[in-house]
């Protein structure tokens, strides 16, 4: 398959069921390589479940997900996954530098020695996200925004082709926000594929070129223009886009934190 024209992520008839209750129902879509995509939908829509089921972190009841035409186990080294902050044990005795160096494991292996070159590369990436001064700090001692940037740095260390990021913009202030946006734009300019679970519909048009709109089933997958219509938003959220944008602007503070 030509990597320049590949489908980076395809999902076919994916279903996930918890305790006899449908969480995701018959999800089918494909995402072209090089896209900058937002996964959006109301709370409980199955956004995080979609990522986890596609990566095999939770079991799907049916269907399949392929990355660059292959199962995840065959191409795991090409994929970087950034989990939600809430799922991380921030008390774990690990420094920021240690966390970033974990990004090497996909292409070096767990048991191979970390080299001086690896450490220098990790420090360059920490400088890129503004955390070089915190390299030796325990990860739980960072602010919310710094923690997000540390995990972003780990993802960058993986040198992946596809980045799957769960609530990347959660708990960051505006300075961190702009830094993260700049990094994403750099990745896109390098031909990388980026997928972000996102909550703020007011800036989807500015940040992304592709949308995956969910509410347990697939409402729309396509360009921002195709998916951010009144009809699609009403189908997913139960209200019109203008009202939803206004509501999200009022509540946006809960998604912002310290740097």
Curated annotation (Swiss-Prot):
Residues 9-241 form the ABC transporter domain. It is a peripheral membrane protein. SMART domains: AAA. GO terms for molecular function: ATP binding; ATP hydrolysis activity; ATPase-coupled transmembrane transporter activity. It is found in: Cell inner membrane. Keywords: ATP-binding, Cell inner membrane, Cell membrane, Membrane, Nucleotide-binding, Transport. One of its GO terms (cellular component) is ATP-binding cassette (ABC) transporter complex. It holds the Pfam family ABC_tran. Its main location: membrane. ATP binds at residues 41-48. The keyword Magnesium does not apply. Part of an ATP-driven transport system CT_067/CT_068/CT_069/CT_070 for a metal. Probably responsible for energy coupling to the transport system. Belongs to the ABC transporter superfamily. This is Probable metal transport system ATP-binding protein CT_068.
């Amino acid at each position: 398959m030509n990597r320049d024209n590949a489908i980076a992520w395809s999902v076919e008839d994916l279903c996930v069921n918890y305790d006899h209750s449908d969480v995701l129902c018959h999800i089918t879509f494909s995402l072209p390589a090089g896209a900058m995509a937002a996964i959006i939908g109301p709370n409980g829509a199955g956004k995080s479940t979609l990522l986890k089921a596609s990566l095999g972190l939770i079991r799907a009841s049916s269907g399949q997900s392929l990355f660059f035409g292959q199962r995840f186990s065959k191409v795991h080294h090409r994929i970087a996954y950034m989990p939600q902050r809430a799922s991380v044990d921030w008390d774990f005795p690990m420094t920021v530098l240690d966390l970033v160096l974990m990004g090497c494991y996909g292409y070096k292996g767990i048991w191979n020695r970390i080299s001086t070159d690896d450490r220098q590369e990790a420090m360059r990436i920490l400088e890129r996200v503004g955390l070089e001064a915190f390299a030796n700090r325990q990860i739980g001692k960072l602010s919310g925004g710094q923690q997000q940037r540390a995990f972003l740095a780990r993802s960058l260390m993986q040198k992946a082709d596809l980045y799957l990021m769960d609530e990347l913009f959660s708990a960051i202030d505006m300075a961190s926000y702009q830094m993260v946006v700049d990094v994403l734009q750099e990745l896109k300019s390098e031909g990388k594929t980026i997928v972000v679970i996102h909550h703020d519909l007011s800036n989807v048009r500015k940040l992304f070129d592709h949308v995956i709109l969910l509410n347990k089933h697939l409402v729309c997958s396509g360009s921002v223009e195709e998916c951010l219509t009144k009809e699609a938003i009403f189908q997913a959220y139960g209200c019109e886009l203008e009202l939803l944008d206004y509501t999200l602007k009022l509540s946006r503070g809960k998604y912002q934190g310290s740097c």
